[in-house]
Amino acid sequence: MNVLATSHGTDSAAGREAIALIREQVRSLLDQRTDGVEYRVHEAYVDVESPSVDDAAAALPKDEPCVIVPILLSTGFHTQVDLRRAARASGIERIVIAESLGPDSRLARLARTRLEEAGWTPENGSVVVQGAAGSSRADGRADMERAAELLSEALGTQVQHGFIASIDPKFHEVVAEYKPEFAATYLLAEGFFAGKMRRDAASTGLPAKVAAPLVNAQDPASARVVAECFVDRMDE
């Protein structure tokens, strides 16, 4: 079975390393299976990097089953438009598209780990603001709201959410309103939005500490968590 592990794409070297590590962990998990299926994991992107998901899907054998799995945290334009277009145009006889990685309680626990690394403790008690890229689609925004609810459950404290893109509620406006000591980063890896989130937090003039993205190449365990979510989505 061909598995198209499809991420957004980034110019960030650190971000690329993190996504590559996720794919490595996916391969490791699939190699451990005893179901008699040969899984071949291929890289693909919806933006910035190559090969595009359209080109990657078109290059696969038409008579072999394929699943496109988004390495994306939420439903959105990419999952509902880009991936579906690639699947239709591929000519592959048996092709399906998996759901996005989140929302998922495992990702919320990983976000808590990143907050703890930034200095957050349960005794802190104050509101946390979670920043996410944002989506033009209502279902994508609902996913991000649910992700904030899951983080609130993982932390045992109030979590507000805001979007880094020009979509309401905007992250910097939520930070300015709630004045959190810590901000959680609901992004998979370093890249454009992670940098903008830090700049937006700084622009408020408030001392909010911004946690790192969920995965980095120096922490294979974080990539393993995401890979487990990936395989679960693939199996659904």
Regions found by a protein language model. Give the residues of each.
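Active-site-proximal alpha-helix that buttresses catalytic centers in soluble enzyme cores
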Residues: 1-236
